[in-house]
Regions:
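Short alpha-helical segments enriched in small residues
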Residues: 1-132
């Protein structure tokens, strides 16, 4: 595991615990690594409600309840898709915060033409705004 990410996960986990908040995570190109780092922190069960790798539309439907209507005019690896998934994972798990990641890892990028390393991250919180 990456020590820098572990340190960041400890800080995030500490803030969540301190405020009595919870988080749910929907990942795509990171393949569960964000969740793994969050869960590597002792006491993560106090704030981590769950995570899922949403690598296909089928997974989005099954785990998050993403509908064809939700996806109209949208594709994966975009800010709007990350925002949708952040809101969905928050709603499905009933967490205070929803975090979603989508992108293209590599070495060649994705089928949409996004270069390797392209990433969109969104956070959905207690308010009505999602930020990417």
């Amino acid at each position: 595991m990456n020590e820098e990410i572990i340190e960041l996960s400890q800080k995030v986990g500490g803030l969540l615990s301190e405020k009595g908040n919870t988080v749910g995570i929907a990942e795509s190109s990171t393949g569960g690594l964000v969740s793994a780092h969050m869960l590597a922190i002792p006491g993560a069960s106090a704030y981590f409600l769950g995570g899922s790798v949403i690598y296909t539309r089928f997974a989005g439907r099954g785990f998050l309840g993403v509908t064809d209507k939700d996806m109209e005019g949208m594709r994966a690896a975009t800010e709007s898709y990350a925002s949708l998934n952040a809101g969905k994972v928050k709603d499905v798990l009933g967490s205070t915060w929803g975090v979603a990641e989508t992108g293209a890892t590599g070495p060649t990028g994705n089928r949409y033409g996004d270069a390797a390393g392209h990433s969109c991250i969104a956070v959905s919180g207690p308010g009505s705004r999602s930020t990417t």
